């Protein structure tokens, strides 16, 4: 008995005893793995926006073919967000449980297929508006899981000191994708018709899915994930995160409010800027206003991540850096949006639009990373909650934008709406935003 007791009293060997932080370290990507995945996720985000922006680029041509007015075009444009807002939390939860990379791959394969088949749906009988709206809702449902799953993946696999640059690099794919569809898509639109733009973006997405599946993912892990989804079973033990405690924190609501404002203002500009330039400057080249703002936004996004990590490494408080990024991403960008509604010069409009879109990319190094600061153990879920709020606001914002244009005939009201929404979110984050973790479960040692 003494020998048994003494053996039971022996400390657990250090190599077999792992703290949560040590277990998290085991899941981190190595430098080569991080570089490879960053490149592939950058491309994935690019294709996400290629398919998302296809409809705004083609709206004018499709409206002419099918006889849609501004309100009907607004319904089609906003229908994406009807689906998008429903799967944010699900995407984050699944990313936390089965792995964000698997969620991303499965959803991309489905939205790529739907994008390719959208022109076919549009010509099914006389209900073209209903069929196109339905396809956009499905696309929104499938793309809604992407960023929550991405946030979950990066919070688990990337070192904290590198998250801002990694996230801003991957986030730059949104501008690259918009740029690709705006440039190549505009050429295809003029030469081959609007259907070719859908075939182009959807086909590239399916090729990306094949490459990631073939070379980066373990087939057994993907099959296991599919089995888990089919059975509806959790992969890991139930979460012990104190949700009631989490949502009592003002900092959590501040980041949700700021994400809502950021997403809403971005979606309004994303959806309506092509139509604004097409109608205000009808003799301008489509590829110019569909390319230049997003082209300049790419280095802006990379710079925001670089300067954010640099400031933190030099000793500036994390929350100070996050708030500075939001002043640029919501405050300064809204000023240029206001200017956009008070000029009749094409050149000035291009400058203001480029500046507004460019400064919005600073949000990648602000609130997007602040969610990982607050709750790295459930970052996907929390981002899903925040982006659900943003998507719902996007539905209202895009529809309201179409209504304002139709009833007032003025684009100034739309840009005023962007400025109001942006500054409400900025003010909330500046007052209540923090960077301390709020997902830690109190232990006896803490009492």
Curated annotation (Swiss-Prot):
Activity is chloride-dependent. Residues 14-26 have a biased composition (Basic and acidic residues). One of its GO terms (biological process) is purine nucleotide import into lysosome. Keywords: Cytoplasmic vesicle, Lysosome, Membrane, Transmembrane, Transmembrane helix, Transport. It is a multi-pass membrane protein. GO terms for molecular function: ADP transmembrane transporter activity; ATP transmembrane transporter activity; guanine nucleotide transmembrane transporter activity; purine nucleotide uniporter activity. It is found in: Cytoplasmic vesicle, Secretory vesicle, Chromaffin granule membrane; Cytoplasmic vesicle, Secretory vesicle membrane; Lysosome membrane. Residues 1-26 are annotated as: Disordered. It catalyses: ATP(in) = ATP(out); ADP(in) = ADP(out); GTP(in) = GTP(out). The chain crosses the membrane at residues 36-58, 74-94, 103-123, 129-149, 169-189, 197-217, 252-272, 287-307, 327-347, 380-400, 413-433. InterPro entries: MFS, MFS_dom, MFS_Na/Anion_cotransporter, MFS_trans_sf, SLC17A9-like, Sugar_transporter_CS. GO terms for cellular component: chromaffin granule membrane; lysosomal membrane; mucin granule; secretory granule; transport vesicle membrane. Voltage-gated ATP nucleotide uniporter that can also transport the purine nucleotides ADP and GTP. Uses the membrane potential as the driving force to control ATP accumulation in lysosomes and secretory vesicles. By controlling ATP storage in lysosomes, regulates ATP-dependent proteins of these organelles. Also indirectly regulates the exocytosis of ATP through its import into lysosomes in astrocytes and secretory vesicles such as adrenal chromaffin granules, mucin granules and synaptic vesicles. Belongs to the major facilitator superfamily. Sodium/anion cotransporter family. This is Voltage-gated purine nucleotide uniporter SLC17A9. It comes from Rattus norvegicus. The lineage of its organism: Eukaryota, Metazoa, Chordata, Craniata, Vertebrata.
């Amino acid at each position: 008995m003494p020998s048994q007791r003494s053996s039971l009293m022996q400390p657990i060997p250090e190599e077999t005893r792992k703290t949560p932080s040590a277990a998290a370290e085991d899941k981190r990507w190595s430098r080569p793995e991080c570089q490879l995945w960053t490149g592939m996720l950058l491309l994935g985000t690019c294709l996400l926006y290629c398919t998302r922006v296809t409809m705004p680029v083609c709206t004018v041509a499709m409206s002419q073919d099918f006889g849609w007015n501004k309100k009907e075009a607004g319904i089609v444009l906003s229908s994406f967000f009807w689906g998008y807002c429903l799967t944010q939390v699900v995407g984050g939860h699944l990313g936390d449980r089965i792995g964000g990379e698997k969620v991303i791959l499965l959803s991309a394969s489905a939205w790529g297929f739907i994008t390719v088949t959208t022109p076919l749906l549009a010509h099914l009988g006389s209900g073209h508006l209903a069929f196109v709206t339905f396809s956009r809702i499905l696309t929104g449902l499938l793309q809604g899981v992407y960023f929550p799953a991405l946030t979950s993946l990066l919070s688990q696999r990337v070192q904290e000191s590198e998250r801002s640059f990694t996230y801003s690099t991957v986030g730059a794919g949104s501008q690259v994708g918009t740029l690709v569809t705006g440039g190549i898509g505009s050429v295809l639109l003029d030469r081959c018709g609007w259907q070719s733009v859908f075939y182009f973006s959807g086909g590239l997405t399916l090729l990306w899915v094949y490459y990631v599946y073939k070379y980066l993912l373990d087939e057994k892990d993907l099959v296991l994930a599919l089995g888990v989804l089919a059975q509806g079973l959790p992969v890991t033990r139930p979460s012990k995160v104190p949700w009631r405690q989490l949502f009592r924190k003002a900092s959590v609501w501040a980041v949700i409010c700021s994400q809502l404002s950021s997403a809403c203002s971005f979606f309004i500009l994303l959806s309506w800027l092509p139509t604004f330039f097409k109608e205000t400057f009808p003799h301008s080249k489509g590829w110019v206003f569909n390319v230049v703002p997003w082209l300049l936004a790419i280095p802006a996004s990379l710079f925001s991540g670089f300067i954010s990590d640099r400031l933190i490494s030099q000793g500036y408080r994390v929350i100070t850096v996050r708030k500075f990024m939001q002043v640029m991403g919501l405050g300064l960008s809204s000023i240029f949006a206001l200017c956009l509604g008070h000029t009749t010069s094409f050149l000035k409009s291009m400058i203001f639009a480029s500046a507004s879109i460019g400064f919005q990319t600073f949000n990648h190094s602000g609130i997007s990373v602040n969610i990982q600061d607050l709750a790295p153990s459930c970052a996907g879920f929390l981002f899903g909650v925040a982006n659900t709020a943003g998507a719902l606001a996007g539905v209202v914002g895009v529809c309201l934008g179409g209504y304002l244009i139709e009833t007032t005939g003025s684009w100034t009201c739309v840009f005023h709406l962007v400025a109001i929404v942006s500054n409400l979110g900025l003010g909330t984050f500046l007052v209540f935003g923090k960077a301390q973790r709020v997902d830690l479960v109190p232990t006896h040692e803490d009492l």
